[in-house]
From Swiss-Prot:
Highest taxon of the lineage: Bacteria
A Gene Ontology term for the protein's cellular component: large ribosomal subunit
Family per record: Belongs to the universal ribosomal protein uL2 family.
Name of protein: Large ribosomal subunit protein uL2
Region: Disordered, residue numbers: 29-59, 224-275
Organism phylogeny: Bacteria, Pseudomonadati, Pseudomonadota, Betaproteobacteria, Burkholderiales
One GO biological process term: cytoplasmic translation
Family annotation (Gene3D superfamilies): 2.30.30.30, Nucleic acid-binding proteins, Ribosomal protein L2, domain 3
Subunit structure: Part of the 50S ribosomal subunit. Forms a bridge to the 30S subunit in the 70S ribosome.
Purpose of the protein: One of the primary rRNA binding proteins. Required for association of the 30S and 50S subunits to form the 70S ribosome, for tRNA binding and peptide bond formation. It has been suggested to have peptidyltransferase activity; this is somewhat controversial. Makes several contacts with the 16S rRNA in the 70S ribosome.
Listed Basic residues bias regions: 50-59
Gene: rplB
Key words of the record: Ribonucleoprotein, Ribosomal protein, RNA-binding, rRNA-binding
UniProt-listed InterPro entries: NA-bd_OB-fold, Rib_uL2_dom2, Ribosomal_uL2, Ribosomal_uL2_bac/org-type, Ribosomal_uL2_C, Ribosomal_uL2_CS, Ribosomal_uL2_dom3, Ribosomal_uL2_RNA-bd_dom
Length: 275
């Protein structure tokens, strides 16, 4: 994997920085594990915008990734590494001994031909998936389940990982990259190591059009709007907001906590916030 600064042949390419991985498969993805997906452009079933700054972008297939990793005791061989347009991490196509192929999140250091295993008897090696009950304390893990059997939900992005801190009864404590310490059931599964493509955060888009290719529309500042559109809008000429930063609906924008899921609050041992 290499970081390439593009030659400044145009203003759009002058600031562009790419992450190039020559180990990625250059052909088409594995067709049986592809699914179609349509863009909603941030609209709900009524046609109202529920997520701003979305729309356009290149069409792409969804890669069906195996987040459960529940084929216990069956060895799998890494056939190839692939780019996935739906996520920041790369994915790996693995071939199980029974002939089935699946996509998984590619951990750091994964190579073509490497053997992987799932289950409580799997060795502690990067890319193997085990119940947290069988993982040594202090191990770096990723693709962590929040409910047993539901599939990985935490630490799935490029370069992310978590650390197993302790086990107490039926729960274990995991420190996430954000600093949050969370309790998870010891029967939840996690994969050893950290997610690959860790240089993803070093790339520079270079121009606005590259974000439009990704389906990201422009973000307009509130002070540039009219009063009817945003609490910061209006004024004669170029004026300040005149109040603390808020969202278009008046919710404080800087550090205001909006989490309302009280049902799982008891699973958070330490919040990611400093205060």
């Amino acid at each position: 994997m290499a970081i390439v600064k593009v030659k400044p042949t145009s203003p759009g390419r002058r600031a562009m920085v790419k992450v190039v991985n020559k180990e990625l498969h250059k052909g088409k993805p594995y067709a049986p594990l592809l699914d179609s997906q349509s863009s909603t452009a941030g609209r709900n079933n009524n046609g109202h915008i529920t997520t701003r700054h979305k729309g356009g972008g290149h069409k792409h297939h969804y890669r069906v990734v195996d987040f459960r990793r529940n084929k216990d005791g069956i060895a799998a061989k890494v056939e190839r590494l692939e780019y996935d347009p739906n996520r920041s991490a790369n994915i790996a196509l693995v071939l199980y001994a029974d002939g089935e192929r699946k996509y998984i999140i590619a951990p750091k250091g994964l190579t073509v031909g490497q053997q992987l295993m799932s289950g409580s008897e799997a060795p502690i090696r990067a890319g193997n998936t085990l119940p947290i009950r069988n993982i040594p304390v202090g191990t770096t893990i990723h693709c962590i389940e929040m409910l047993p059997g539901k599939g990985a939900q935490m630490a799935r992005s490029a370069g992310t990982s978590a650390m197993l801190l302790a086990r107490e009864g039926i729960y274990a404590q995991v420190r996430l990259r954000s600093g949050e310490i969370r309790r998870v059931h010891v029967e939840c599964r996690a994969t050893i190591g950290e997610v690959g493509n860790e240089e993803h955060s070093l790339r520079q888009i270079g121009k606005a059009g590259a974000n439009r290719w990704r389906g990201i529309r422009p973000t307009v500042r509130g002070v540039a709007m009219n009063p009817v559109d945003h609490p910061h809008g209006g004024g004669e000429g170029k004026t300040a907001a005149g109040r603390d930063p808020v969202s278009p609906w008046g919710t404080p924008a800087k550090g205001y906590r909006t989490r309302s899921n009280k049902r799982t609050t008891s699973m958070i041992v330490q919040r990611r916030h400093k205060r």
